[in-house]
């Protein structure tokens, strides 16, 4: 299977630049062999079997979970490493205050200098060349990358998460543009040295070079650190491409909402982690006659079409979801998606060779093998699955995937939602006055870090646009880009922007809104607003539903609870507004003037 890289006849592309780059990386990393991935089913099976032989994969019960595998990572390699994630822009100012910057020349020396960590890093291993496309092949909204990796786990995962293999090389032609992504586990094998099931290195670097559109990742085999099409390309590098080319690369789900009568609407929504993004993307509405279908659960690439509307694609081909908390009662559609063809990492194993995690079932099994390989019972006092345990599954298996989820033209976005986890102050749903006010709402996305004292605003963790860990350039400039993309557009065709909060708590510390499927009631009001059919009331912070406009029929929600969810307390909001300048000042002169205008207008409206 290994091909001699030096013989052009054995290389499945005529792209000179790509061939020369692959040769260059092979020379640097010194793998035993080089394999160009073709993305075929046969290749997937072969690599999966190799991973089983190595002990990385364990095949799950073929009847309960066909063509599915279990993997347990090294206990030190379980999540994204934000403190080891670098933006290596030419100027430090371009990375901004919320990213870790490193001088690109210095970083290249660390990687490829005389003592560079990539030097010989693939010794004793196979180097896989993984051509992949973010978005449907052939779409004007899509973009190509090539990941070089010494991890077969990455190669098989990329087949699920992206369009991968020979069709991508065919699309690339002889001179097409591609983002260069280099990944090594940083675990070379000397001759005769035994391998471990999950190789990695205690030193880790996840580095992005925005100007040259490159990603270099060292030392981790896990998730977003290693599947470089996901956060590294689709958000950090793509956000820079979007800035330069006038589009948006966003940490957003995309869903299709169809009322009993009338046209379907497409909605994009950005929430920080642990705010129920995947649950909303796969929502089962409780409102009669309404349907939700999924376009994407994590990332949206959006461009303005010739008709002046904003069109979005889901650049991914799979779901890489957090397993714990996903269950029949929280996300039945995700559970149905996971029937087979899935890889589960760091979940627990049942005695009959299936998987389990916290929140998956009402009843906890009496005995499991936990993610570290230990015997586990409910008395163990530790989680059976790691809190960041993941599933990797083709999006096409989702029972409510929209037929147009791979439409190369994308889908027209009518509404954009922002939201965080706020126990206090923030109402259930707020419509922005206009686009710039909506950008102001997005810029102030926050979740509470600490429990708030009664009536007080708790300490906030700001996560503008839910992009804080994923923006590839200065966050102040990024906010400015949101203002700029709409400047010359027909305002009537822009998506309306909303801020939602499912997480308000009462004085007893209990959630007031039931959430989950009931969130469809809020979506219903939004669609009716878009159609000009629903009442709204102007408040100092935006437009809220009137009590009658929000459909609460059949909901166990008292009038006082509804008032609580739809009231703007001016005094609390003066406190809230007082926190904004410190946040906007973080970005200094990079903060767009328009956001300061919005802040001053808010203060004035609050009186």
From Swiss-Prot:
Entries under PROSITE patterns matching the protein: PEPCK_GTP
Cofactor note: Binds 1 Mn(2+) ion per subunit.
Any one Gene Ontology molecular-function term assigned to this protein's record: GTP binding
Gene symbol of the encoding locus: pckG
Positions contributing to GTP binding: 274-279, 390, 421, 516-519
Classification via SUPFAM superfamilies: PEP carboxykinase N-terminal domain, PEP carboxykinase-like
Protein name from the UniProt record: Phosphoenolpyruvate carboxykinase [GTP]
Residues the record lists as binding Mn(2+): 231, 251, 298
Xref: Pfam families: PEPCK_GTP, PEPCK_N
Top-level taxonomy: Bacteria, Bacillati, Actinomycetota, Actinomycetes, Kitasatosporales
Record note on quaternary structure: Monomer.
Pathway assignment: Carbohydrate biosynthesis; gluconeogenesis
Record: residues binding substrate: 80, 222-224, 273, 388-390
One GO term describing the cellular component: cytosol
Compartmental location: Cytoplasm
């Amino acid at each position: 299977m290994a091909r001699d890289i030096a013989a052009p006849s054995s290389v499945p592309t005529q792209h000179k630049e790509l061939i020369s780059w692959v040769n260059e990386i092979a020379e640097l990393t010194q793998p035993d062999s080089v394999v160009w991935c073709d993305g075929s089913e046969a290749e997937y099976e072969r690599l999966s079997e190799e991973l089983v032989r190595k002990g990385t994969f364990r095949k799950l019960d073929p009847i309960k979970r066909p063509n599915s595998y279990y993997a347990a990572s090294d206990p030190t390699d379980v999540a994204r490493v934000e403190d080891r994630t670098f933006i290596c822009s030419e100027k430090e100012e371009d990375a901004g205050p919320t990213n870790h910057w490193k001088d690109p020349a210095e970083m290249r020396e660390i990687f490829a200098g005389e003592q560079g960590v990539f030097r010989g890093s693939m010794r004793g291993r196979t180097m896989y060349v993984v051509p992949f496309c973010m978005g449907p092949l052939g779409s004007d909204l899509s973009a190509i990358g090539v990941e070089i990796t010494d991890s077969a786990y990455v190669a098989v995962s990329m087949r699920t998460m992206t369009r991968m293999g020979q069709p991508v090389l065919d699309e690339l032609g002889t001179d097409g543009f591609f983002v260069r992504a280099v990944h090594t586990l940083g675990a070379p094998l000397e001759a005769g040295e035994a391998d471990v099931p999950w190789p990695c290195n205690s030193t880790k670097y996840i580095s992005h070079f925005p100007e040259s559109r490159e990603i270099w990742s060292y030392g981790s085999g896990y998730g977003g650190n290693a599947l470089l099409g996901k956060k590294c390309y689709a958000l950090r590098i793509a956000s820079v491409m979007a800035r330069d080319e006038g589009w948006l690369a966003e940490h957003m789900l995309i869903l299709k909402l169809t009322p009993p009568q009338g046209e379907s609407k497409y909605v994009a929504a950005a929430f920080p982690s642990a705010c129920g993004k995947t649950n909303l993307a796969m929502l089962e509405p409780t409102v009669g006659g309404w349907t939700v279908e999924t376009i994407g659960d994590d990332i949206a690439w959006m461009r303005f079409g010739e008709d002046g509307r904003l069109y979005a694609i889901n650049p991914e081909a799979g779901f890489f979801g957090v397993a714990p908390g996903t269950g029949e009662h929280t996300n039945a559609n995700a559970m149905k998606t996971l029937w087979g063809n899935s890889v589960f990492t760091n979940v627990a194993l049942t005695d009959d060779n299936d998987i389990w995690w916290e929140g998956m079932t009402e009843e906890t099994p009496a005995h499991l093998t936990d993610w570290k390989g230990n015997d586990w019972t409910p008395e163990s006092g530790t989680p059976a699955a790691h809190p960041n345990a993941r599933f990797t599954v083709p999006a096409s298996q989702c029972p409510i995937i929209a037929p147009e989820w791979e439409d190369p033209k994308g889908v027209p976005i009518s509404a954009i939602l922002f939201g965080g986890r706020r126990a206090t102050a923030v109402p259930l749903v707020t419509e922005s006055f206009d686009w710039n006010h909506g950008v102001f709402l997005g810029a102030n996305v926050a979740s509470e870090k600490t429990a708030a004292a009664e009536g007080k605003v708790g300490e906030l963790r700001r996560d503008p646009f839910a992009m804080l860990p994923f923006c590839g350039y200065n966050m102040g400039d990024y906010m400015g880009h949101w203002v700029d993309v709409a400047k010359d557009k027909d305002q009537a065709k822009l998506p309306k922007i909303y801020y939602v909060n499912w997480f308000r708590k009462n004085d007893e510390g209990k959630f007031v809104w039931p959430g989950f499927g009931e969130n469809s009631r809020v979506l219903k009001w939004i669609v009716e607003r878009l159609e000009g059919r629903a009442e709204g009331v102007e408040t100092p912070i935006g437009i809220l539903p009137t009590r009658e406009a929000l459909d609460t029929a059949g909901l166990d929600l008292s009038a006082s609870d509804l008032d609580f969810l739809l009231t703007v307390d001016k005094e609390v909001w003066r406190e809230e507004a007082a926190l904004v300048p410190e946040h906007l000042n973080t970005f200094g002169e990079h903060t767009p003037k328009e956001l300061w205008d919005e802040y001053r207008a808010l203060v004035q409206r609050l009186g």
